[in-house]
Amino acid sequence: NRKMDKMPMREEVRVFRKQWVKKMREMSRVAKEMPSRAVLDEKLSKIVLTSQTVHENLFVAQPQQVNLSGRIFGGFLLRRGFELALANAYTFAGTFPLFVNMSDVDFRAPVEVGDLLRFRAHIIHVGEPGEFDKKTLELKETNVFESGNDIERDIVMQVEAIVVNPKTVRPTVTNSFLITFRVNGGLLPTVLPESTDEAFGVFEKVIRPKLCGWD
């Protein structure tokens, strides 16, 4: 999020970020090293790592999708990415998700006709819509991990479009964006980042924007 990158961070937000990342990493280490023990509470809420939520598809860019410049239309790329993300969220939740928003749309490089294009979508965060709408930055189980049967849950999906060239063995990320879906009810797994860098990235993309109105 470019706006977030330019915004100064309050000290209390900085402290909260450190605590949040530490908690994420503690839980993800358990999920990685001792998966059979990776539960959150007496309800046996499941834990999954971000890599376990990946869905992909691969296709050749066709001339039917070109724009006036002779390159693949950006709206087509967004639609294909959205369809993959929707299918991913549906598979993950077991109930049809509702679209909330698309953000952090980044067109980095053009896609040419004939390019081999891979779309990859994975979940980076699952939480309640108002999980951080509070006047305090205390790290609580209820705003980080707790799941429930009759509450709304937001599923945040990271989507990338990647041109892969088998001849040069050089993949290029051409597009990336975030999509948020919402589902109502059901006990969803908690999705955890697998590295400290990934945890910081999730905080900046998902958590910090929810706190930016407090500054």
Question: Could you tell me what each predicted segment is?
Answer:
Residues F73-T95:
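Active-site helix/loop of acyl-thioester processing domains in fatty-acid/polyketide metabolism
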Residues S103, H122-I124:
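Conserved positions in beta-strands of structured domains
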